[in-house]
């Protein structure tokens, strides 16, 4: 199969590319950075350098593909984050219509079924609906949980406050996921036949927030590390 992978060599797209190349597929990786070309080619894939905000570029890149893995690259500098995310989804849809690609595996998120109240994920609600409106195109949305590596954002909190916390309680459950498991799920969906529009949730483990704090604390030599709500968000 000829497969296009968006997301450059990110935490999901890199292992996904490796899986697909190893399986014998002809893979092209989209990246906005020309300096990634050598690294992409070293994986056995082709590089398509350009911006997902450029519909003409996407149309050229999508041409001839049997399947496309779509994701919206983060852009926290966007003045309207939902508008940015929705816009990338619209760009993908235009390129899909123009090129006749028949199979899409799209990275979405848990919570993308809700139109409001989920922060940036609202944009992924829009993307799902935009792609679902494509006629004659099989679309599978992957809805992963909370990425394990998101805990890196709490390093300074642990160092300087001696706690791990957020705006939810230690007894609340977290659906945790490894990017490698998302890549596995994406590769599986790309390589197996499916029709229509569908959703696949991707979760590696389920823990309470308190359990997560205890596990991380034990791993870094801070067995006293606790999950706290409130003080971390005063």
Where are these regions (language model features)?
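Cofactor-binding loops of NAD(P)H-dependent oxidoreductases
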Residues: 50
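Glycine-rich anion/phosphate-binding loops
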Residues: 82-88
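Conserved small/polar residues in nucleotide/adenosyl-binding loops
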Residues: 232-234
